[in-house]
Structures are given as structure tokens and as C-alpha cells.
Amino acid sequence: ADAFHSQVDKVELYVFDKDGKFLFKQAEEGSTLGTGCYLMEVKLPVGQYQFMAWAGAHDSYDITSLQAGVSSIADLKLQLKREETLIIDKELEPLWYGEINNVDFTGTTDQTEVINLIKDTNKVRFVFQGSNEDSWGVDVNAYTYEIIESNGYLAHDNSLLGDDNLSFRPYHIEQKNLAAGIVELNTMRFLANRKA
């Protein structure tokens, strides 16, 4: 299902020439993204291009600054901000990534290209629920919840770069009653070939 219009509130599009030289960045945010039929108009001369997009990159992330005509696509990186403790215990803004390589603009007609986005953030929720308070009780604060992963530094192609071991811990712990509790934490993307 297309979650763009309901979950994405900011888009940054990076445009590169066919050789990967940075040309410019174009951004949009706000209610226009939530219409369900959003299109970003990009004015380009005839030629071949590469497009890369990060969506939802707000205060939780740092993206490298690029210089037009100088920087290359390999210079574009995103890093999750972190304290010296390497503990991430706040809710992250949902982050999305997409790219299109080898786009050929002929200039003969209006041309539409679709950038499919994949989500780079995960929310993990633990729900503890007993049948009643008399037969089963749990104190959600009596446990430690943590995901350790070095997945907070992303390359232009969304691959993971070498990173610190980050400690993802709960940003929300709620004891509903003696038999129910909720714990939420988040992390950046998981990969099947990596152990967390």
C-alpha cells in the first residue's frame, strides 16, 4: 500500500548528472505532500540523470552538504544524530529512501518518473497483557529493553556505512495496570544478513 501521502511530510530530492556529479537539491514539505497525488516538478535540460531522495529527514538526522559541480553522488550520506553515550532513547521521525538511476530526459514531452521509497526506520512495540490483574502481573519497568546495532550511517545507495554500536532504548514505557504494559523503541533499518 502507498503510505506516502499519510506518512511523508518532507522530501529532499538530490539530482546528479549521468556521471554522478551533484547538480542541485530540491525540497518540499508540508500539506502538499499529503494530497495523495503529489508530483514534484523538476526543470532540467535534455540529458541523462540520477535521482536520489530522502523523505522525512528532520532533526534526528544529519545529511552531508553537497557543492554543485564539485560533489559526487558518493559524497551524499545520512547519519543518525547521537549523544556521546550512543544511546538513542527518543522517538525518531520516520525516514524513507529512494533512487532512480539512468533517467533519460528527451525534452519532447512532459515526463514523469516514480521514485519508490523504502522505510529506513523501524518501531518496535512490546505489549504485555495478562487475563486479569489477580492472576498475572507484570512490572514493565523491571526489565531492560535494548537493541544494539551499528545501523545509523547510510550511504547514497542506502547501504550501511561503518558506524558506532548504537544502543536503541525505549522512548515510551507505560504501565496500563498490573496486568498490562506497553514499551516502544525504534531503530534504523535492519538487514537480513546482519545480527542485531
Question: What residues fall within each predicted segment?
Answer:
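A short, Gly/Thr-enriched small/hydrophobic beta-strand-prone motif that recurs across taxa
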Residues: A1, N116-S131
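Short consensus segments that form the blades of beta-propeller domains
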Residues: D2-S6
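Tryptophan-paired
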Residues: D9-L66, W136-A196
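Short, low-hydrophobicity acidic/polar segments
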Residues: K21-D120
